[in-house]
Amino acid sequence: MNIDEELTTILKNNSNLKKMKEFLEQNIFFSLTGYEGFFKAFLIKKIKEYSKTGKIILIVKDEHTLDKIKNDLQVITNQIFELNYFSPLVYKGIGSKSTIFNERIKFLFNFYKKNPGIYITVLKSLLSKIPDKNTLLKNIYKIEKNTNINTADIEKTLITLGYEKTLRVTIPGEFTVKGEIIDIYPFGEQNPIRIALNFDKIEEIKKFNPLTQLKHDNEILEFQILPKKEIIWDDKTINTLKTKIKSVEYKKILEELDFKKETKTEEMFYPLVANTYLGDEIEKHTPIVNFEINNFEKEIEKIHQEYEKLYKEAEEAGKNIIDPKRILLNYKTFNLKSDVLFSKIKSLKSKETIEFKIESERNFFSNIALTKEEFENWLKNGFKIIIAAESESQKEKLKYIFKELPKVSIEVLKISSSLIIEKEKIAIILESNIFNTGQKINKAFESSKTKAIDSFVEIEKNSHVVHINHGIGIFRQIKRIKTSSLEKDYIEIEYAEGEKLFIPIEQTNLIQKYIGSDPKNIKLDKISSKTWIKNKANAKKRIEEIADKLIELYSKRESIKGIKYPEDNELQLLFESEFPYDETPDQIRAIKEIKEDMMSFKVMDRLLCGDVGFGKTEVAMRAAFKAVMGNKQVIVLSPTTILAEQHFNTFKKRFKNFPIKIEVLSRFIKNNAESRILKELKSGKIDIIIGTHKILSKKFTCKNLGLIIIDEEQRFGVKEKEKLKEIRISVDCLALSATPIPRSLHMSLIKLRDISVLKIPPQNRVKIEAYLESFSELLIKHAIESELSRDGQVFLVNHNIEELYYLKTLIERLTPYARIAIIHGKLTGEEIENIMHNFIKKAYQILLATTIIENGIDIPNANTIIINNANKFGLAQLYQLKGRVGRGSQKAYAYFLYQDSEKLNERSIERLRAITEFSELGAGFKIAMKDMEIRGVGNLLGREQHGEIESIGLDYYLTMLNKAIEKKMGKISSDEEEVDIKINYSGFIPENYAKNEQDKILIYKKIFKIQTEEESKKIRSELHNDFGPIPEEINSLLMLAELKILAKDLNITKLKEKNRALEIEYKNIESIPMEKIIEILQKHPNLLILNPSYQKSIFLSFKNIEKSEKINYIYKNINLLKTST
């Protein structure tokens, strides 16, 4: 449903809308009042439609207001542009976020191009200068189909515009050149573009998906590429700046601008080199709309006071910054007049006021009977009723609940409020008003974002690798070797004592990234040593044992009959509808899998894997609710008292509208309460009991236990695990783990153990604003004071325990009034629990900690985290720590600090920036998560596996495990051998096709992992899509891979070139197709040769065959053995 069109039709005769149009046509200043909720956005869009220029300027007070209005407007239009102001933190040495630069340049470009739209600006942006039209538009780079470009020139231009050359484009501001393909991810765009060249001519321009790398269908004839920032620091601009500031005072900044053409906090200087104001550039007859700013003078004064305070603090800290009086207009010089005023109350400033009567809130508090009664009354009175569902799955649930009211429309609508207009008899009711959940947070999910990253993505120059036959070495380079008339690439791997092997590219599939030990502790294998063979044999033995155990467990579980629960009832649907977020696709899948288990006779023993915050608890609560609806009791088992308390609070809040009794057992519960709980558990009065391993003791018995939910099972002791094994035999079990597991292990175990994996994170339920900065007392003081001023709490994390106490002294000096606690691994378990308990209860405002907080509890009130010496942590750790905040409804902040004295290299800075800049994390992050996957393997298969993983590497370990399970389950034959191909050919990746070695390894790995003809077709398509037309040299490699598939199908084990003939060796004599050979010889007498000395072989003659045609010739003729009749 198009809500904008729907409302426009319903309100087509509305007198207020007619008045609005008249006033705008006659240039009469008027105010609007009585509007509510989403209706504000509808009115703003109407003003834009009535505008003579097709655009409006909407002035809002601040960023918060801008975000709220934008969210509603996005439902009904995509013509929205925003001009936010730069962060005031520039006065503390912190640059603005890249998104602000992107949105500003998009706003200014469209504004100067006179494109229709709603142009939203915060008041601050009107007080500061912007570049004029000519200055801005001259920096736009235009590309057109069928025009000629020079790749060297385009690279130079893009770098000038602020773009960065990378191996693969994944985020705005990156570009790459791959042969005749140029990928650019323009600033301000949702998707990158791919330019296909034919020599220097642009043959095609298309957008593509940065995750799948697949092109969109629609072709683009021309495209305009925006610069990163509105100011380009060319020589002229830098010289202008030098005349405006004391060059001695700002020497360092000026040097950076001269050298790098950009610098942190450079936006502070923009108004000094810009030359106009937005207010002076607004086109005539464009309505200027004031959104709820009742007193411009007062608001402008507040802005000046804010900046004056920051300026004074920075001066006291010895920082050189620009006086705000030089860059901000004051009220006297601000002369912009509004045409329309949105006002919550009737304004005296306008003679004309249009008053609407809109209701945006009507809560039904999950009382479905009351809701139905109200709806029936509305329908009798001729109302049109629309329920705004949050998602398709919610729509289906609502259809079921309101099935007796067929006249009630149920549509998926992403609006922020209900809308009731009595006069026009329309009621649009949010599902959150029916279920009293508050507005759901909606984000779009792409399943492709969870696409598995194969190990080949990670193999980089000088990284550790495993060759299946030779062991652990270091990948040095891809080396081109010419011998007589042949030319091939080889992979150079260095082993212990500097020994080197040159591996033919056909063996790329035998090379994997080594993941196991810390790089400092990795021991390289010796080529001639038997250590690798021994390590492989030991690992194989242990893997066989693990596979046997898993298969035995699987068989035992399959033979037991369990509880069969009924289908979902109305209460279950109501419970699920009250979830205050949209489910991720993975959550929906996991819930479906769990319910299918519960509604069958098999005993459920399912593992639910997913990172902290990925939604495991919600999935578990739905399973618990289903068990209670089936008249069964539920145990929720937690490894610590604090986690048990947290689960109790979460369950109580989530189940509050339902008649389900929940209790918690922990050491914080008094003895008399414990004995009451014990009795009620035994009598069946308690539906859900939450607690630590104490619940497993004999004195606690349930009347009718149906489900046990285990949180972080690996953290329990041996005794508890043994007890759980007993319970699992007859009771459904759902185990939760926050440690991710590798996809390959998941695929291995999927047949033996029921596993649901949550790999898609909820898309930024609350935005975390992250900063990467050098250590600064001023910054730490600001971060803490800002959080405490909104009654929040702060984490300050450091890798070193001793330094925590130094930091405590520093914080006490900076914020003497703050209540501070310290927590680290040297404290006892009880001490840690007490401190955390008190922090949750807000007895402390600041918690100084090591990475002990990286996993576990949610503290919604703690929304600022400062990580000192961030460069000392792994990327995975930083990601986990960042996830400690943003768990509630407040905006969250993460500060990643490093010491200036450390002189971090560019790679280290980029590595850290990946965490701070982008919520969408790519391959680099997934690679960093591998250390967590090792923990995941240990958790699933036993910690004792760690030694084997270290000795042969994680990827090879999992390959062996997968084969062992497949073999024992009869899925593959005992020893499947690779086809041994020894053919003289020329095959490599030309330099102009893929220049960097990472891309080359990726291509080689893909080619030599091909197992089917379909895979070959897919890879041919991918290569053409990513790099351009496939050259002859790569085609030879693909033909070689396809030849291997064909040989395998025909039971051929070896293809070996000998004296202008090819030996074709079969697995056994029985495999030789003698009838087909005779048929071929009758037609082509000299094509095949039989030699009695080679009983399992035949020979293919290829005299007078060109080298370039050789593999094609071999493929075609071996194919005759399969297809001749």
Curated annotation (Swiss-Prot):
ATP binds at residues 610-617. Its main location: cytoplasm. The keyword DNA repair applies. It is found in: Cytoplasm. Keywords: ATP-binding, Cytoplasm, DNA damage, DNA repair, DNA-binding, Helicase, Hydrolase, Nucleotide-binding. Its EC number is 3.6.4.-. InterPro entries: CarD-like/TRCF_RID, CarD-like/TRCF_RID_sf, DEAD/DEAH_box_helicase_dom, Helicase_ATP-bd, Helicase_C-like, Mfd, P-loop_NTPase, RecG/Mfd. Residues 774-933 form the Helicase C-terminal domain. GO terms for cellular component: cytoplasm. In the N-terminal section; belongs to the UvrB family. In the C-terminal section; belongs to the helicase family. RecG subfamily. This is Transcription-repair-coupling factor. It comes from Borreliella burgdorferi (strain ATCC 35210 / DSM 4680 / CIP 102532 / B31). The gene is mfd.
